Amino acid sequence: MSKKVEKVVLAYSGGLDTSIILKWLQTTYGAEVVTFTADLGQGEELEPARQKALLLGIKPENIFIEDLREEFVRDYVFPMFRANAVYEGQYLLGTSIARPLIAKKQIEIAEKVGADAVSHGATGKGNDQVRFELGYYALKPDITIIAPWREWDFKSREKLIAFAEQHQIPIAKDKRGEAPFSVDANLLHASSEGKVLEDPAQEVPDYVYSRTIDPQAAPDQPTYITIDFEKGDAVAIDGRTMSPATLLAKLNELGRANGIGRLDLVENRFVGMKSRGMYETPGGTILLVAHRGIEQITLDRGAAHLKDELMPKYAELIYNGFWFAPEREMLQAAIDHSQQYVSGQVRLKLYKGNVILVGRDSRYSLYDQDLVTFEEGAVAYDHRDAAGFIKLNALRLRTLGQRKKKLGL
């Protein structure tokens, strides 16, 4: 403890670990604790978090629980999917994209209640500590940050449990031993890491999966759906207009039923180590295929290729926690500009873990069937023009070839 803290806003789930952190903040810092619990669509009842906080001595006016599902999808998930953001070729950034919103809300609450510190439950080995704290500092540069996992001396699960028992923190029976793996979930995905998943040579046990059925157990008949887009954002499924959160929840249902969205990944953490995670992103997996499908006919080649070049950097910025950085905002502005004509409808076939694009249509389509056809009636296109095009593009290659020939190489 390096600084006197009067009031601290804790990102609080109501689970055992953050309940221990809550009591630790009270006993170690002597601070007044304010709890913030976010509903990001993790699928859990949040009222128990309120009751747990009250039980641990938090004043009712210091308990904040907010339904952020619509804001999460509208202002974070959808902008990210306009970029087709994928980290290291596979990861759809489900955990990463949730952290800046939580950090933003914590800072807003800190300003509202006059808190001089914020706290989180991320460990000292992971990426989340970086993501939370970069967000805090970006939004309130003079904020004090308390990261208990980097400060306290609880070196084992047994010591944590002993602390909980000492301070009469309720402990579920299944929490007394080490959990077989840790879970993070929101409306975009569910992730599992640690323990039984730490050996990358071993297959993920079936009991780890919570958001998807086994693709082999999925229906033998495919499911066909249509998704409508307006300026890069999905707005309707099968002709039914939905809010962002409702739409993603519906895609999750469809993906779950068809075994879509499982990913076993060894990724490179920002802090320097490799980690193995199991991700389930059913709705997001469908959405990515659909968005790329509508872009195929509405984006100019140059814009599409530039977007694909920018995407890895954009994804890396989100993964590493730089959502509020100017370079992410610069890239977002370019990406959003590219989406002004990305409107139309795609048709998809969902089948045993696969998302298959089977149709796309748009009033802004750049696809000209009369131009590309080999049949009679094609629009004016002089095949002889290709000769000059090829010769000009071959000029430097011919020059290089002449040099090699001259030097006998």
UniProtKB/Swiss-Prot annotation:
CDD domains: ASS
GO MF assignments: argininosuccinate synthase activity; ATP binding
Compartments, record wording: Cytoplasm
Reactions it catalyzes: L-citrulline + L-aspartate + ATP = 2-(N(omega)-L-arginino)succinate + AMP + diphosphate + H(+)
InterPro entries: Arginosuc_syn_C, Arginosuc_syn_N, Arginosuc_synth, Arginosuc_synth_CS, Arginosuc_synth_type_1_subfam, AS_cat/multimer_dom_body, Rossmann-like_a/b/a_fold
Chief localisation class: cytoplasm
Source organism, top-level taxon: Bacteria
EC number from the UniProt entry: 6.3.4.5
UniProt family annotation: Belongs to the argininosuccinate synthase family. Type 1 subfamily.
Name of the featured protein: Argininosuccinate synthase
Organism from which the protein derives: Nitrobacter hamburgensis (strain DSM 10229 / NCIMB 13809 / X14)
